[in-house]
Design a protein with these regions (language model features):
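A short helix-loop-beta submotif of the ANL/AMP-binding
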Residues: 63, 82-101, 105-109, 117-123, ...
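Conserved AMP-binding/adenylation subdomain of ANL enzymes
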Residues: 95, 221-238, 246-292, 301, ...
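Structural core segment of the AMP-binding/adenylate-forming
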Residues: 99-175
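Conserved ATP-dependent adenylate/AMP-binding module captured primarily in the ANL superfamily
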Residues: 107-142, 223-240, 275-291
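Adenylate-forming
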Residues: 126-138, 270-272, 289-326
């Protein structure tokens, strides 16, 4: 702490926005793997990987698609997705174009619709399959419940066969339409400053109706930077991020901090830590991907403590991090 305090914050942290983070990471790490998606929890299964350069291209394309749909810096983009690569396009492309609003799919339609209406969500990015939580049918119902919505973007499942996508009615597009937009710059020409609002995150709703908390770009950038400094995160690190991305733990320390530092971040199936097979195979996944740190909430750590190593080599792990409300 004393070492960090010897430099003014503006000098130590010149980055203004989450968008700047991804521009810098793509320049620094290029073809290095940024995100690894595991279609199943089987350690032998072939993963899907995106490099830092590919991730920035996708962020540009997504932001430009949203801009084309009328999203501006004051407009909210709601997100209803499981664990998937495209969640990162929705998050960071949404923040580059407007204000992202990640949503917990386990909340009732009424609670989600109320939050979207409060945020005046203009676009909803939703998973185009039922999955285990009825994503697509919920998205269709929300479309009728939220008066401010002008468009719904469908995210196809990773294993959807060519030509199997359903016909979409007016006002609905496949997120793959992003490929029709430039991937090397923001068409809007937006210059994001630290005080701009980046996201609306909702509280858990355990003490009544969920409430919206505003995140500025500067606050998210500082949180990511602080995590990197405190934990000594470095480009050779590899971590499994099994948190849901409607939760700040999954988005800020679990994703933004790692992706600002050149880390390979693993997305363990669409079910994340809710997938029992991910927990059962966790130590074998650590061995397969040579993970260097373990990150989970206490309930997940308790579950992992009951999973035998089964001969898995986990010697690459350097530390464990956790956190919880008390």
């Amino acid at each position: 702490v004393q070492r960090l305090e010897t430099r003014p914050l503006a000098e130590a942290l010149p980055v203004q926005s989450t968008y700047d983070i991804f521009v810098n990471s793509a320049a620094a790490f290029g073809d290095k793997t940024a995100l690894t998606f595991l279609p199943t929890a089987d350690p032998a299964a072939e993963p899907i990987r995106w490099s830092y350069a590919q991730l920035l291209t996708g962020i540009h394309q997504t932001a430009n698609l949203l801009h084309h749909l009328g999203v501006g810096p004051q407009d909210a983009v709601a997100v209803l997705l499981p664990g998937c690569l495209e969640y990162h396009l929705a998050l960071w492309g949404g923040e580059a174009a407007g204000i992202v609003q990640p949503l917990n799919p386990m909340l009732t339609d009424e609670k989600i619709a109320a939050m979207m209406t409060l945020a005046r969500a203009k676009v909803l990015i939703a998973y185009g399959s039922e999955g285990d939580l009825g994503y697509w049918s919920k998205a269709l119902r929300l479309r009728a419940l939220v008066p401010t919505l002008t468009a719904v973007l469908r995210v196809a499942p990773h294993d959807e066969a060519p030509g199997a996508a359903p016909a979409l009615p007016a006002g609905m597009l496949d997120l793959a339409a992003r490929h029709q937009h430039p991937g090397d710059h923001l068409v809007s020409g937006r210059r994001i400053v630290a005080s701009d609002i980046a996201a609306y995150f909702h509280t858990g709703g355990t003490t009544g109706a969920p409430k919206l908390a505003r995140h500025s770009h500067g606050a998210q950038v500082f949180t990511a930077w602080g995590s990197v400094q405190m934990q000594g995160i470095r480009p050779e690190d590899v971590g499994i991020n099994g948190y849901p991305l409607f939760h700040v733990a999954g988005v800020l320390p679990g994703s933004l901090a790692a992706l600002s530092a050149g880390v390979e971040t693993i997305i363990p199936t669409t079910g994340l830590f809710r997938n029992r097979e991910v927990i059962a195979n966790y130590w074998r996944l650590v061995e397969r991907y040579r993970c260097t740190y373990l990150s989970a909430v206490p309930t997940v750590l308790a579950a992992l403590a009951n999973v035998p190593l089964g001969g898995a080599d986990i010697s690459t792990l350097r530390y464990c991090r956790t956190g919880a409300a008390i």
